[in-house]
Amino acid sequence: MEFPVLTVNPAKIETACLVVPVFKDGDLLPAADKLDDASERLIGQLLDRGDFEPSLGNVQLIPFAPGLGAERLLLVGLGERAKCGESQLIKALDAAFGAIAKLPLDDVAATFTDVPVGERDTAWKARVTLEAAHRACYRFDEFKSEPAPAPRLSSLTLLVGDEDQAAQAELGARVGAAVGEGVSLTRTLGNLPGNVCTPRYLADQAQRLADGADGALNVEILDEDALEALGANALLAVGQGSAEPSRLIVMEYRGAEDPEEAPHILVGKGITFDSGGISLKPGAGMDEMKFDMCGAASVFGTMKTVLGLKPRINVIGVVASAENMPDGRAIKPGDIVKTLKGLNVEILNTDAEGRMVLCDALSYVERFKPASVVDIATLTGAAIIALGHHASGLLSNDDDLALDLLDAGENAWDRAWHLPLWDEYQSQLDSNFADLAHIGGRPAGTITAACFLSRFADAYPWAHLDIAGTAWASGDKKGASGRPVGLLTQYLLDRETEAAETRPSVE
């Protein structure tokens, strides 16, 4: 999608449709005011007569726009000015572009950058505008025999007030477009059925990403023979009941001037289907366990975004992928497995398999001497009980890293909530038969899952994002959300800014 930024009078812009946000209090925003003057108070009259109610998310298409360069206007309600925050703007954007996606339009223009949203600047508003456009145009219909017509939108022009705003808008739109593409890839991988999206399929997707990266991405695939030689028995144990072989996928992007600069590493849980194994899940809703690889999908999506933005830091994406199935060879409750780190783990419930593939991946990445490691996983139902479907759970062994991730989530409006990782919880993992058990009972399930992972992440700053409640939606809108690509991308961009400030200047 193209995203030109212009400073022209909105009344003169030639476009198939001009999207105009309107507050409920009747005071028009600067762009809408200019349009109103040029069209003999078209917008004002609609509001005065009650023909358009600018409640939050309400939209109305005006098919003819006399006196204006635009062929059509799309009015979108912002609700009350005093209540307009980030969530309200994003809801209005989703409503506007949801309507646009249903129309036969190739190009539109929008004036959302003049909407006041707290202390958010033009760059942020441009970013979320592009993200919303990509979100609305996303379709997953490759298994539909007669798919609906795809949205035609290919160009979104952002209208701003002056050149200073234009520079900010261009920067924000570039990030928003890249995040939008990364989110779309994440959603597609998550939405694919388990008989298509297998560990081998994910490995192929990594190679495909590298093939289109002009040498910017190096990929290494560790198959089961390599994993066995390595000693990654926890990862292998999860997949040993499946006909689908497990994989460890490593994607390396070296964007820093020094290729040996400590990388930031993302580790994704890639359980391409989770039946629960011998500890079999209930049948109702088991189809949604294809989404148990959404952590891995978010790593793919973030790496795609990184390739689009080319930050000057080193980033490594690692995906630990397996299929968890019941079989005569499958792991059983009571089994003890020796991990890559050398710790012996007692398996108490085979449906707690994500932490097993992750623990070996966390041990593996130690060889890169990372600046930070963030793992992303649909790990615990307890995270949904604690946080619902709005915030991802965040736990970390490093308070500075946790704060950086929280800040990134607030900036990207892809938020997380910090939970404690206190030593007092560790005793719940005590085992009579092994070095530790891999689950700690019902109390504090999200925390004890992170406690388990922390045993394998003690050599570097590490954080864990539990996205069980945010990775996908159920019901009529069932599908992968693409989260937390926005948070992860912002975290990496912030690390690029931080690195630029600390690198010695060259004279």
Curated annotation (Swiss-Prot):
Annotated signal peptide: none
EC numbers: 3.4.11.1, 3.4.11.10
First-level EC class: hydrolase
Superkingdom: Bacteria
Keywords: Aminopeptidase, Cytoplasm, Hydrolase, Manganese, Metal-binding, Protease
PANTHER family: CYTOSOL AMINOPEPTIDASE, LEUCINE AMINOPEPTIDASE-RELATED
Binding site for Mn(2+) 2: 269, 274, 292, 353
Protein name per its UniProtKB record: Probable cytosol aminopeptidase
Species this chain originates from: Chromohalobacter salexigens (strain ATCC BAA-138 / DSM 3043 / CIP 106854 / NCIMB 13768 / 1H11)
Gene Ontology molecular functions: manganese ion binding; metalloaminopeptidase activity
Physiological role: Presumably involved in the processing and regular turnover of intracellular proteins. Catalyzes the removal of unsubstituted N-terminal amino acids from various peptides.
Residues annotated as binding Mn(2+) 1: 274, 351, 353
CC cofactor note: Binds 2 manganese ions per subunit.
Gene Ontology process terms (BP): proteolysis
Names of the cofactor(s): Mn(2+)
InterPro entries: Leucine_aapep/pepB, Macro_dom-like, Peptidase_M17_C, Peptidase_M17_leu_NH2_pept, Peptidase_M17_N
Record-linked Pfam families: Peptidase_M17 (PF00883), Peptidase_M17_N (PF02789)
Cellular component GO terms held in the UniProt record: cytoplasm
Catalytic activity from the UniProt record: Release of an N-terminal amino acid, Xaa-|-Yaa-, in which Xaa is preferably Leu, but may be other amino acids including Pro although not Arg or Lys, and Yaa may be Pro. Amino acid amides and methyl esters are also readily hydrolyzed, but rates on arylamides are exceedingly low; Release of an N-terminal amino acid, preferentially leucine, but not glutamic or aspartic acids
PROSITE patterns to which the protein is assigned, alphabetical: CYTOSOL_AP
Active-site residues, record numbering mapped to chain: 281, 355
